[in-house]
Amino acid sequence: CNGDAKEAEKFLKEKGLAAVEKRASRATSEGIIVVKTANAKAVMAELTCETDFVAKNADFIAVGDKIAETALAKGYTDVQKELSDMVLDLATRVRENMGLRRLTAVQAGSDEYIAHYVVIVVLKSDKPDALADKAFQEFAYDCCLHAAAFTPLYVKKEDVDAAYIDEQLEVFRGQVAELQKPDNVKEGIVKGKLSKHLAEICF
């Protein structure tokens, strides 16, 4: 580049982007989810990469934090070029395919509280004072943990369709059919299995 620093920088950047394009077809099955909250608003960003090693890399995690913080500060509700470019910049330095797959934002109302743990949960209360209550906030966080662990489908057990419960009972009875135990004991095991299953799919 004949000693021209700007030309050298441009050359290196173009070379880096060309390398990124070559890696674009590689599968990105690893990654991280970053959640940031402020002023009753939450932003969730999903960054993907090829390997678990990069997913745990401090620079990769820092980019995820920066993306979520920028989206939160600027009011972005989906993927923007400014955010994608942050990942692209890292990809030119780390020889691995990576990207910003998704980004979403949630704004809580005046009667709502946002909690997060890999997932975002918004709880609503008709009592404004409850939103600042420690027990209420801990409950919201517990809901996040439950959602992350089990991906529940219903709010409460009463919401579960009766036909679905009958199907599960049939499955569980099939599982204990060969046990050398009295029928009443088998039925107790079935009820226990159903109770555990409902606890997982409901909040």
Regions from the PLM with identified roles:
Residues 1-203:
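N-terminal assembly/interaction segments in proteins that build large macromolecular machines
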